[in-house]
Every structure is written in structure tokens, then in C-alpha cells.
């Protein structure tokens, strides 16, 4: 039996990347996994051949007794590791997350198995453990996350719109780099290029207010800018259906689900040329651009908006390339946790 941890995911009112991972894996493991929540879960039900599986963030302070639970080893334990962003980018991360992360990474070393959501995040975790000088650590494998963000079938044919539209999906915060995207878009609008920019994502309560103010100010100047704070999966699907390209100018990612999800919807993606994103962009359908290089970003967005031959090539790659699914991710876990 798999005891699947949904302590935070089960009651989350928003759809962050971490929450989406937990929700989709829970769906994929349904019938073979029992959802549990700390501390109400009766840990006495965990048998020696059972697995406790978590994709959440945790600490001893948030979950009193969790360290003792790992040390006792009443059953087997497995975890999904997302990223070390709170340590690599502390200045743009919630202070609570920054304070929690070192202890969280140390606790991961006490698990029996760990899956990282990308090769890049795997190296971050292993590097932290080496830096800590930990004598004993579990094996860490890479789990390919699903590109199918909803129940809709994969898009294999794209229709062009009369007026080009760009779509950027992600929480409003410095890490997602919407300020940079707004600056680049404003320059392109000022040069006479006509296009719509749709931003989708909740506001980070610690860092997001200045970005929201910038969106409101710029939208008053340009009717092509649209903000959707609480868009449902159905609404996002509609936005993808009318988008010429998605835009991911992010500073850091654990996996880069917005890139994968855009490709699933058949939408080419213009994104930051980060090592972690190259793991998904290398297969085609993407236009990687140097991080925060305004001239290169302006040129890339102009090209994807105006060059039909380039766009057709990227769209063909996006709709034909192999993409991972959540069913495959769940099957990977299911097969591994049966051994």
C-alpha cells in the first residue's frame, strides 16, 4: 500500500506547481494509494512493506514528530523533490521557505528513495548533500512530470489567429519575471507591433503587489494587455487555443511545467535559456532566449509574432514531438514502489 501525503495539497485553495504535481499523481495512483494528512494520519497503519510517499515541503517545526517518524522506519519512505530555489534565489523567495529549506533537504536524506523532477534539480539536491558531508543518502532518480495539465486530448492541429496573442502562465512574482516581460512588450507596442499579452496567475502575497500595479498601469495605456488572476483550467485551455505562442521568461525553475503544458496544447514556447528548461526545449517547439537579454527577447517575440514560417515550424514540432504524461509518471512510481 502507498500512503500518499496530501497534507497541504488536500486543502490548498490555489493551483501552484507543487499542488498540481500532488493532485495529478494522486489521480494517477488512485485505487493503489491512500491519501493521508499529517498529523491526523494513523501512522500505526503503515506496515513494514508499505510506502509513505510525499511530494510536499515540510520541516520538523511544521510537522512535530516527523524526524522521529523517519528515523523509526516503521515502513518505507519516498519523496519527490522539486527544487532548491529558496537557497539559490533567497532574495526573491518567501522568508519562511528560505528558513525551512535547509532542514527540508536534510530530512530528504533520511528517505529510502527520492525522485527529482528534473536532472538539474537532482544535481542541486546531490550537491547540497555533498556540501553537508552527509555520509548516507538515498538514491535519487528523475521523474518526468506530465505535460497534460487537463483532461483534454493533446492538440495536434493549430489554427492561426488574425491578431497574434501571447500567453504567460505563472504566479505573479519576481522569479517568474513578469516585470521584464512587461518592459519588453511595452517597447514592442511602442514600435507599432500589434499583439495581445495575456498573463495568468495569482499574486504572490509577499512579492507580487508591484507587478500587479505595473500590469494595471500598463493595461490602461495599452488595450492589448489582459490579466486573469483566478483562471480555471477550462479558461486557461481557451487562452491556449487562441495563443500564437506562450512566454516563459522565468529566472529559475524546478522543472518548468508551463513549457511542457504549452507544448501539450500545441503552442510554441519562447522561454529563458536555462539548463533546467533545456531538458524540455531540446525536443523542439521552443525558442530559448538568453536570460534577461532585452534585445534578444524583443527580437525573439517579434519573430514568433510576425514570421509565419518560423511559427509554423515551431508549431509542427510542438504538436508532433514526444511528451511525458501524468499517467506515465504515476506508472513510474507505481512500478518502483512495488519492489
Regions found by a protein language model. Give the residues of each.
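Carbohydrate transferase catalytic cores enriched for Leloir-type hexosyltransferases
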Residues: 1-339
